[in-house]
Regions:
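Active-site and adjacent substrate-binding regions of carbohydrate-active enzymes
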Residues: 1-244
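Conserved small/polar residues in nucleotide/adenosyl-binding loops
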Residues: 247-254
Length: 254
């Protein structure tokens, strides 16, 4: 029933309504005329992205400075998805690092983020705990994977059906050489570069599926720490990848 409405009653002020989040994905929106769709989208964007912008800016500047000034650590903000327009300026003002994920570009005209365009004050990563890993994402949407293979990696021909260790290493290397000050990758994405040590079952790599309340944080390493410490080829490969990216970072700073 809830998916058949465009507006939700306000729970504090009777007789007032606000646009329902994600209504554009449902039949009720698709059944509208183009004129009505445009009208709804204007209301939607105004309500969620502009109307409360000053309010959220004031709230942020009231609370965040106390947090950022109470520690010497670098502070990273999770600024993905549906956020007010003021977030970027607040983070820049307070020198909070943004989070950059290539498959979730912040530039609307991009299908994939451009690693060399990431802001220096940012954390670059391939996947988060709420997303599929690199290998899992590769197998989710073949057409999207094909476009990534051709445009982002610059390869010709048909993309492999699975993300091979060689492909994963290339993608990891690209991220390590991004413009971000930090590149922090998940354990699963690090292991993806080695065919011997990565999990044989790619579905077991994912940590959490936010849309599924039954999918809790049940990820477990499929190898022991003792095995990992003895994985000389894997450790050597990672040790070789990181200094190269560090050299790139130092060159950027100078």
């Amino acid at each position: 029933l809830i998916s058949n409405v465009l507006f939700i009653p306000d729970n504090k002020e009777q007789g007032k309504y606000h646009p329902r989040i994600g209504a554009q994905r449902d039949f009720i929106f698709r059944s509208l005329s183009e004129e009505d769709k445009n009208a709804f989208n204007k209301l939607y964007n105004q309500y969620y992205y502009h109307r409360h912008n000053d309010f959220w800016y004031q709230q942020a500047m009231k609370k965040l400075p106390q947090l950022t000034q109470s520690t010497r650590m670098l502070v990273c903000g999770e600024d993905l998805g549906m956020i007010p327009a003021c977030v970027s300026s607040v983070m820049n003002e307070l020198r909070i690092l943004s989070l950059e994920i290539q498959r979730m570009p912040k530039e609307p005209s991009y299908e994939f983020g451009h690693l060399n365009e990431y802001p220096y004050r940012s954390v670059c990563t391939i996947s988060t705990h709420d997303m599929s890993t690199l290998r899992g994402w590769w197998e989710e949407d073949y057409q999207q994977t094909q476009r990534y293979y051709n445009t982002m990696l610059g390869h010709y021909g048909t993309a492999p059906a699975i993300a091979t260790p060689e492909l994963c290493e290339e993608i990891v290397r690209n991220h390590l050489n991004s413009n971000s000050i930090l590149c922090i990758l998940s354990f699963q994405d690090w292991l993806s570069v080695d065919g011997k040590w990565r999990n044989p079952n790619v579905e077991e790599e994912r940590i959490n599926v936010p849309s599924n309340p039954r999918n809790y944080w049940r990820y477990r390493m499929h190898i022991t720490l003792e095995q990992l410490m003895k994985a000389k080829e894997l450790n050597s490969k990672i040790s070789e990848l990181i200094p190269v990216s560090y050299t790139h970072l130092r060159a950027h700073e100078t």
